Amino acid sequence: MSRNLYPNFIQFIQDSMQELTDRGQEVELAGVLYHIGENDMSWGPFRRGAAERMQTLVNASRESLDLPELKCFVSQQPPTDDKQVNEIDVTSMIAEVAAADPHLIHVKTFDLPPQEKKLVLDTAGVVALGEELAKSWLKES
């Protein structure tokens, strides 16, 4: 995975689970949440590869955590409406990958509150995103 974020992501999960276990808690990782955001929705090369990167992250996470059926909830914000990238149907590509994986839930968060900036979610947008992920989690649990 790029920029060394992936090892830190996995280590954080493992450390958190171990910390809870050390405190006497029974721990089960029931799923992970991942957001496909601004860069993957707006820049052509990222938009073209978003679905493949998502699948790579999901597969690698399951392998690293030794949980082949780990549920992954992947939220997607609306694709940027720009003539330079509109021919790249990123939503369909992501939906196709999700449809082939019974443990991957594609959460289309296309009704977020209006944002001041074109791509960046503000506080209200992040809260709404969290609410949509929570609804999806509850529906699937």
Regions found by a protein language model. Name each.
Residues 1-141:
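Cell-envelope and extracellular/periplasmic
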